[in-house]
Amino acid sequence: AGYSARWLQAVLRGRLGFGGAIFTDDLSMEAARHIEGRAISPVEAVRAALDAGCDLALLCNQSLDGGKVLDETIDGLARAQLTGRWQPRAASGARGQALLPREPAPDWDALMRSPAYLHALALIP
């Protein structure tokens, strides 16, 4: 479904009214990079997923090898944008921005002493 505009836009967003961010599967997994039985590159997979309606693409554990796959994907998206083969969606950017924290992270030591944290910790068997 991650490459299907029908499922992502018509069903998930349209029929079901989902307004949150849609993430891809981990596109570094080869099994997640097949369309119609054909293996595709991470760059092609990211473009296809974003074109279908995903807002954020996951390429997990790709900081290895100097981040080569990440760099190739960013470069590939930039080339696709310059040649008119892909355009980022403003709505996708807004949904991604909505996931960012609105305030600084709490101090770790203060968090570990907070009643909410201590209560949650006590619930763990």
Model feature map: region roles:
Residues A1-Q97, A105-A110:
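Second-shell residues forming the walls of enzyme active-site clefts
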Residues L100-P125:
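C-terminal extensions of enzymes
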